[in-house]
């Protein structure tokens, strides 16, 4: 099944082949459609850079985050506002068309997940994997690289850390590595990093 995005070259299919093992759901289908277009155009890296820049803008602006997440705004209002942001940020081409199509389809609320899924597809293409890490305070360089090395040893791949700071968590460190279970040896390494973080605090 193709979504209404065909006019911009964006076709969202129900089945995405090997990508199904990496991403899933509606956001995964959108991300895969964009990834396929970017691959064909030789623009995988530039599209990722544009999406990362837009994600940073959303993270920095409460108003923009509300626009993306709130169902109160109409598709027309979201499209007009997000288009202005894209133009101001100099985001055009595939990434710009993609975000506009997402807004027109009333799927802007899922944009952060789509961006994350696109990053996962890019990482898989490069032989990398992405770990979602939640910490109560920013990681020091030493803790960042200790965690990165521990996860790399566990997966046998270069690991990209997607770090989120959430002061409300009490465990010191939460790591999500796709659907893989954290084994005992890695848990021991993570615990040592947790204890080190607590000592610094």
UniProtKB/Swiss-Prot annotation:
NCBIfam families: ATP_synt_delta (TIGR01145), PRK05758.3-2 (NF004406). It holds the Pfam family OSCP. The keyword RNA-binding does not apply. One of its GO terms (molecular function) is proton-transporting ATP synthase activity, rotational mechanism. F-type ATPases have 2 components, F(1) - the catalytic core - and F(0) - the membrane proton channel. F(1) has five subunits: alpha(3), beta(3), gamma(1), delta(1), epsilon(1). F(0) has three main subunits: a(1), b(2) and c(10-14). The alpha and beta chains form an alternating ring which encloses part of the gamma chain. F(1) is attached to F(0) by a central stalk formed by the gamma and epsilon chains, while a peripheral stalk is formed by the delta and b chains. F(1)F(0) ATP synthase produces ATP from ADP in the presence of a proton or sodium gradient. F-type ATPases consist of two structural domains, F(1) containing the extramembraneous catalytic core and F(0) containing the membrane proton channel, linked together by a central stalk and a peripheral stalk. During catalysis, ATP synthesis in the catalytic domain of F(1) is coupled via a rotary mechanism of the central stalk subunits to proton translocation. Belongs to the ATPase delta chain family. It comes from Xanthobacter autotrophicus (strain ATCC BAA-1158 / Py2). Keywords: ATP synthesis, Cell inner membrane, Cell membrane, CF(1), Hydrogen ion transport, Ion transport, Membrane, Transport. One of its GO terms (cellular component) is proton-transporting ATP synthase complex. This is ATP synthase subunit delta. The keyword Hydrolase does not apply. It is a peripheral membrane protein. It comes from the Bacteria. It is found in: Cell inner membrane. PROSITE patterns: ATPASE_DELTA. InterPro entries: ATP_synth_OSCP/delta_N_sf, ATPase_OSCP/d_CS, ATPase_OSCP/dsu.
């Amino acid at each position: 099944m193709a979504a209404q995005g065909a006019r911009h070259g964006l076709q969202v299919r129900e089945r995405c082949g090997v990508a199904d093992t990496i991403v899933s759901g509606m956001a995964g289908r959108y991300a895969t459609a964009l990834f396929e277009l970017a691959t064909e155009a030789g623009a995988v890296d530039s599209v990722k850079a544009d999406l990362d820049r837009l994600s940073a803008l959303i993270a920095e602006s409460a108003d923009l985050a509300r626009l993306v997440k709130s169902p109160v705004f109409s598709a027309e209002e979201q499209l007009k506002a997000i288009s202005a942001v894209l133009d101001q940020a100099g985001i055009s081409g595939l990434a710009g068309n993609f975000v506009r199509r997402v807004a027109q389809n009333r799927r802007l609320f899922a944009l952060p997940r789509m961006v994350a899924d696109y990053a996962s597809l890019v990482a898989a293409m490069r032989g990398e994997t992405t770990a979602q890490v939640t910490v109560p305070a920013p990681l020091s360089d030493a803790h960042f690289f200790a965690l990165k090395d521990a996860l790399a040893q566990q997966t046998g791949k270069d690991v990209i850390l997607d770090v989120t700071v959430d002061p409300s968590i009490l465990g010191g460190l939460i790591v999500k590595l796709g659907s893989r279970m954290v084994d005992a040896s890695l848990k021991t390494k993570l615990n040592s990093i947790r204890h080190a973080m607590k000592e610094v605090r």
